[in-house]
Amino acid sequence: VAVADKTLAELDYWKSRRSAEGRLANHWYERAFTEPFGLKREFFDAKRVLDIGCGPRGSLEWADNAAVRVGLDPLADLYRELGTDQHKMSYLSAPCERIPAPDGSFDIVSTLNSIDHVDDIDACIKEIKRAVRVGGTILLMTDLHEEPTPTEPVVCSWDLLDRFRPECIAVFVRHLEKVHKGNGHESVFAGVHYDHTNPATRYGILVALLQRLV
């Protein structure tokens, strides 16, 4: 997928959502960042948090207990017209493959429904591991689908977590069915375990909490 086409598709999607919603909602993000990973809000106390592929909704607006809350998105500058300039969280306009931050800058790095949107997943994972401090946490949630789409050019599989080794270890992993169309968070909240004995081709959702060891 050409970069320009992908950018246009992403921006068109968010403009259509704003038209449909009036104002882009973000009320479910606290739950999305905590419940699926077995965490409480207090886990984010005084933490430096980076959300990869944050989009324009304000994914970290809820986290006013964090020391630093930054959203990274290659379209962050364009999202100002969608209202991000009114948010309290900070934004960095850059791709995951080139995170503009020193090594170990963050206590928590999250990628919720974004790692399949990148252009180079191996470069992205390398950067995520670099940006999180030793002992820090990576929160990962992603759709697993059979075919690429204009905005999701990367096809991930259940063995995705192997790519985070040897620096990181998976502490908590869930394989879930995608039981709701559209908003993947609703399927995660539903928590239906993925039946690997069912041979039917379908979406799945991988949820994992990883820790950087070295």
List the predicted regions and their residue ranges.
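Conserved class I S-adenosyl-L-methionine
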Residues: 139-164
